Amino acid sequence: MNGLPRPRRSLWLGIGLGVVLVVLAAAAAVAIAGLQPADLTYTPNSESQMTNIDVSRAYAKNYYGAPTATSGAGGTWNTPLNQDSNYASEARSVAKQGDNWLSARSKVADKAIVLDVDDTTLTTWNYELYSNWDFNPTTNAQFVGLTGSTFTGNAFPATPGMVDMVSDAKAMGYAIFFLTGRGDSQHQATIANLVSDTAAGLPDLTTVTISGKTVPEIDAGYPMPTPLDIQHGGFTDGLFTKPPVGQYPAYLNKPQFCGPSITAGVSCPTIQYKSGVRAYVESQGYDIVGNFGDQFSDLLNGFADKTFKMPNPNYYLP
């Protein structure tokens, strides 16, 4: 979700057990109602109602099974994702639920799945460690695979359980579509990370170097997305990246999708953009049996038989 200016990301800050329970209950109620969860606007009355930010970071590191040493810029980001962590277990559980659902619906005609990229099919935890939860589009692009406009290798690992789930879906005859808020300029690099460098028509790299640290370059090994007619940006594969303002495709120019944003000359909000793309996919004759995302904005506004929320405590994108 990175090619265009990105909404501010924020680390979850605990604010006392009672408030946390209220917030979680409210979020669950909102999710059930199919509405966008509101931004947290509670103003603590005292320090005792907050969790220390460093403690919150430690909670996140424990959840992901990361080293406990303070990371900071470039610290322990190059440690491989812990496949035995609570995060990995929870991600695999959602992937298994998805696999079971897709298997049960395998007789559906013209069936498809739609998947977000960041923290749905690729895990960006190493960037959170690298940046100390301070998103910067330039450094983030290096993890995506770009230094300027030059492809320098991908650094994001696959989300635990998801490559197997998507591969199973492909074997069952599902069309595979990826839908991300990353910009068109990151399209090829994203294909390289999801599938392979050669699948994206890019040099087949084996390492990537960021801030002086060299790590193995990652090709996650997902199936190639299903081809569609020419989309925005001239791409014909089934990875939908977000076009620049002023270059949205005609199918998004509807009042319920990006029409108001197109008229105003501003970026289309995630919910309207992603639901508009899903509507387009279904207009091509597909039945989206499952829609997978780590943000509520990946999942809301319909055009999918069932949605699956991947775990991600690191940031919130409306």
Model feature map: region roles:
Residues 9, 32-40, 187-318:
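C-terminal cap/substrate-recognition subdomain and adjoining C-terminal extension
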Residues 124-128, 132-135, 189-190, 301-304:
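Short, solvent-exposed loop/turn and secondary-structure capping segments
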Residues 129-153:
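A solvent-exposed, charged loop/short amphipathic helix patch at secondary-structure junctions
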Residues 2-115:
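Non-catalytic pre-domain segments flanking phosphatase-related domains
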